[in-house]
Amino acid sequence: MQKPGKNVILIPGMLGAGCTSVATKLAEALGLRVVNSEVIIRRIVVEKGTSFLELAKIVSDGEVEFEKLIRNEALDFIEEGEVVVEGRTALMLLDQPVTLKVFLHAEKDFRAKRVAERRQIDIEEALREVERSDEDRRRLVEKLYGKSWLDLGLYDVVINTSRIPVEVAAKIIETYLQVNRK
């Protein structure tokens, strides 16, 4: 559970909807840290004194459940507070009492174009990645909470980034937080 008075913002969303970009802009504006699977894996590697390859072997051998490992570390980050948790990692924390939960979505073609540009892959491959990611996220939320990840009742704010640029999305969230300070 987060410490009282400490901001913890979750920004889960669809692959290619701009979760990382929005989280980064928001964190810069508010002086918060961005947390995602990459940050968590780096922390695990440092804390355990292991390598990425050794960690991958432990996970692939079934010695440890990857999602449980990521979730436990993410819980430590939200306990510390002053973080924006983004992407798939944020989906693992939807059951936690946090400051704000913002879901980012966008049209599939828009997301595929972003993924193709970012990863320098063709649009067909990007579409497949978007579809795989949607299915992975669907299964994850269903497994953890027995709900659809597209159930808007899970989130406080929902933003369509195919219509609202990431800079504006970050500003909307920042403004919401300022207006709703207790």
Regions found by a protein language model. Give the residues of each.
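Post-Walker A helix-loop "phosphate-sensing" segment adjacent to the P-loop in P-loop NTPases
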Residues: 28-35
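Glycine-rich phosphate-binding P-loop
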Residues: 11-26
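Small-molecule kinase domains that catalyze NTP-dependent phosphoryl transfer to phosphate-bearing small molecules
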Residues: 64-65, 123-169
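Conserved phosphate-donor/acceptor-positioning beta-strand/loop module used by diverse small-molecule
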Residues: 97-119, 123-132
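ATP-dependent small-molecule kinase phosphotransfer cores
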Residues: 37-85, 89, 109, 121-122
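Pre-Walker A (Motif I) flank of P-loop NTPase domains
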Residues: 4-9
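Glycine-rich phosphate-binding loops of nucleotide-dependent enzymes
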Residues: 23, 34, 44
